[in-house]
Design a protein with these regions (language model features):
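Beta-strand secondary-structure signal
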Residues: 17, 113-115, 184-186
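Active-site region of the double-stranded beta-helix
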Residues: 58-90, 97-112, 118-123
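Short conserved micro-motifs at the rims of enzyme active sites and ligand-binding pockets
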Residues: 27-29, 176, 196-199
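Catalytic core of non-heme Fe(II) oxygenases with the double-stranded beta-helix
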Residues: 94-164, 191-203
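Short beta-strand His + acidic residue motifs that chelate non-heme Fe in jelly-roll/DSBH
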Residues: 102-105, 171-178
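A short alpha/beta connector and helix-capping loop motif
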Residues: 179-189
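Non-heme Fe(II)/2-oxoglutarate
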Residues: 1-81, 203-208
Length: 208
């Protein structure tokens, strides 16, 4: 008998990936360089003092690209029935020198979070995501890792890469390897409008 078997992944965690597919403009580069000199120590690396970087006029092109990614996430993943507008709340730049790292964390008070990589070495730089429930009742040593048996998963990242993911998803950056100063633009996304349903006693009007 020649049987065929299929595997379905129920309730998966979405990670949306894209790339801006262009070089940074002179104004954008000037913006990144400015914040590099105006930052403070974070847990393992440094973060821009400005927590609303994407509000700058020089970031208009970045906002347009990121907005397309957010809309794709909303249309394909969330699929809201009611009119809801998703918008960027805060945005900041992270700078990670060789030997530094970015601590394990999530993003509270946010629905979608994302990272746009400004300066990243694809051979060395990565983002690591962690499974929400890492408890394993029985732990088997694996011959190979896949989406079903892994407690964490990483993606190599390079210049212009964009990652969007649920804000509740735990992530971190290991100790930086390579020679470049890794620069990434992180942001949070929330919603305004009508969510839930009156007949289900879940109606809520979110206003900015």
């Amino acid at each position: 008998m020649n049987s065929q078997f299929t595997i379905d992944g129920l309730f998966p965690t979405p990670i949306i990936s894209s790339n801006i597919n262009r070089s940074w403009t002179e104004k954008e580069l000037a913006l990144f360089d400015y914040h590099k000199d105006h930052c403070h120590n974070n847990m393992g690396n440094t973060t821009s003092n400005d927590r609303y970087v994407l509000n700058a006029p020089e970031a208009k092109g970045l906002v347009g690209f990121i907005g397309q990614g957010i809309q794709h996430y909303v249309d394909k993943i969330i699929c809201p029935k009611n009119p809801v507008e998703f918008y960027i709340t805060q945005s900041w730049l992270n700078y990670t020198k060789p030997g530094e790292y970015h601590h394990t964390h999530e993003h509270p008070n946010s629905i979608i979070s994302g990272v746009l990589y400004i300066d990243a070495d694809r051979d060395h730089d990565k983002i690591i995501f962690h499974k929400a429930n890492r408890y394993q009742q029985i732990k088997f040593p694996q011959t190979e890792f896949n989406y079903f048996n892994s407690e964490s998963w990483f993606f190599n990242v390079g210049n212009g890469d964009l990652k969007l993911f649920p804000s509740s998803l735990t992530h971190n950056v290991e100790q930086k390897k390579g020679d470049n100063v890794r620069c990434s633009l992180a942001f949070n996304v929330f919603a305004k409008g009508y969510i839930g349903a009156e007949e289900e006693l879940t109606a809520l009007h979110l206003r900015m």
